[in-house]
């Protein structure tokens, strides 16, 4: 089977410079969701028909394994599919999808493909309590589909029909080529409707069959930011349901955002308002506090993330404790049992087992050994305005509060750095290193006093 995805619309109601099909659902362009569904069907070929903002669309999805066809100007859905025909092969079946219908399910599409067989025309239809705005499915007395009428061209009786066309269909490529060549635009919109091929199929004796989706929301399109937000919530709720079915405890399923791929082990708990972006892997028995943001990370078993922690491009070992208000940036690797407390930031650093930085520290471009204590207010001075340098700290080091380590510098195994030290040279193993001004007290010193007005 071959797939045609119509993605040429402007989306004026979006009121956005971003092409409609690039508007995001769960952190990915809507069109990317549709392409993923087509790929899951193992389609022989995927052709995307683009138009408005075509350069931006192609640039954003340049790595997708698709072919591109330009529709310019946009003269309706039939005209759009016509642009894809040079990429299609007679003898195959063609599935028509839409770049602004991002939640279409693969099981539904498989049933539609099966219904079409190798020679029938299969339509995906739904029955709506309020069918306003949709093309109506018209059937004869025996229940056979005879044609589709768009609402603007429908009579009063036809508008009362509740079964509507979703636009998604499967048809033989050879017949599709013939039907599209004969399309006219004698309608209220002066456009070439893809739906007109149904009447042609019926006239030629081609069987037209219909399939209902597993859920109506699969067929919902997006034409406004309000509809975009509605589908976002639907999608997130579906993700939350799948997570809970897999054993994840969500404190409130309506307050989680997954904008990528989230893989969870057993007995994972996730509090409210957490955001997961990219690929996130969470091992067994992990607890994630409220309002955390986790992006492209692997969280080790038994780890605890306290509220308001941000974890990005990070790998943690087992039984780590992070936060509250901690941040790990790209390139961070934590061993087992590492503690990062409130207002600790780590970037491009490796911290080995059982080391701790419990509060108010910046660790950048550093390699820290086992069982190291990083005191409050400690920073690695890794940037000289032009280049960045690394700090290396051995096992069993104790770093006093308010210490600055000016890289490149090494702290030997078992060393102690006194509070307030500014370390500019390597600190030897198993020694106390202190670098600060000598403390003095001045007897009789008087604090300056402000002069009063008139004095």
Swiss-Prot record:
Pfam families: Hexapep, NTP_transf_3
Stored Gene3D superfamilies: Hexapeptide repeat proteins, Spore Coat Polysaccharide Biosynthesis Protein SpsA, Chain A
Keywords: Acyltransferase, Cell shape, Cell wall biogenesis/degradation, Cytoplasm, Magnesium, Metal-binding, Multifunctional enzyme, Nucleotidyltransferase, Peptidoglycan synthesis, Repeat, Transferase
Positions that bind acetyl-CoA: 376, 382-383, 401, 419, 436
Chain segments carrying region Pyrophosphorylase: 1-225
Binding positions (UDP-N-acetyl-alpha-D-glucosamine): 6-9, 20, 71, 76-77, 98-100, 135, 150, 165, 223, 329, 347, 362, 373
EC numbers for this chain: 2.7.7.23, 2.3.1.157
Cofactor(s), by name: Mg(2+)
This protein's pathway: Nucleotide-sugar biosynthesis; UDP-N-acetyl-alpha-D-glucosamine biosynthesis; N-acetyl-alpha-D-glucosamine 1-phosphate from alpha-D-glucosamine 6-phosphate (route II): step 2/2; Nucleotide-sugar biosynthesis; UDP-N-acetyl-alpha-D-glucosamine biosynthesis; UDP-N-acetyl-alpha-D-glucosamine from N-acetyl-alpha-D-glucosamine 1-phosphate: step 1/1; Bacterial outer membrane biogenesis; LPS lipid A biosynthesis
Compartments (UniProt record): Cytoplasm
GO biological process, one term: cell wall organization
Active-site residues, record numbering mapped to chain: 359 (proton acceptor)
Signal sequence segment: none
Binding sites annotated in the UniProt record for Mg(2+): 100, 223
Function: Catalyzes the last two sequential reactions in the de novo biosynthetic pathway for UDP-N-acetylglucosamine (UDP-GlcNAc). The C-terminal domain catalyzes the transfer of acetyl group from acetyl coenzyme A to glucosamine-1-phosphate (GlcN-1-P) to produce N-acetylglucosamine-1-phosphate (GlcNAc-1-P), which is converted into UDP-GlcNAc by the transfer of uridine 5-monophosphate (from uridine 5-triphosphate), a reaction catalyzed by the N-terminal domain.
PANTHER family to which the protein is assigned, alphabetical: BIFUNCTIONAL PROTEIN GLMU (PTHR43584:SF3), NUCLEOTIDYL TRANSFERASE (PTHR43584)
Protein name: Bifunctional protein GlmU
Gene that encodes it: glmU
